[in-house]
Structure formats: C-alpha cells, structure tokens
Amino acid sequence: MTANTLTKQIIKFVQLNGGQAERVNNIARKIGNRFVKSNMTKGTADIHCTIKGRSVKIEVKIGRDRQSDAQKLYQQSIESAGGIYYIAKDFDSFYEWYNLNFK
C-alpha cells in the first residue's frame, strides 16, 4: 500500500464516522524555474482531524519511512497542548487505535 492510498482511506473512514479530516500537503511548489517552500508549519502531520471534539493529527509512514526531527518536535507540541498525535503505518492498526480511543 502507498502512503497516498492509506491517507485517503483514513480520511474517508474518519469522515464516514462523523469526524472531520483533511489532507495537509507541506511540500515545496515549483514556480517558474525554482521551488518555493511551503508556509505550513515545519513537520506538520499529513492528516488533521477533529474526532468527537478532539484535535487529532495523523502522520502516515509506510515501510521504512521514519519521522524527521521536525515531525518529532511537531508531535511534542501537539501532545503538550492536549492534542492527539498518531503515526499510521497501516489501516488495520489505525482502525484498532481508532476503536480503542473513539468508540
């Protein structure tokens, strides 16, 4: 499974279960012959959600992909502010985590 496919599955699942979810693209854009950095927060999660009134950020990691230092700092800032941060590696483990925390 690709990260793109897993991201779409998670967003659809959250929406079908009454939550709000959106994909956040934090990549540089090509303008003319040069790339311009995004103005998003460095390390932001791939999916931002509100589930049962809670702020949830989900980072999608497939295979050997790991969090960058910026993503680890972002996770710390979300959790210290009372938000929920989850690293999704596959849909089955996400589904289990979701049911443990929101059902």
Report residues per predicted region.
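Catalytic phosphate/metal-binding cores of nucleic-acid and nucleotide-processing enzymes, i.e., regions
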Residues: 1-103
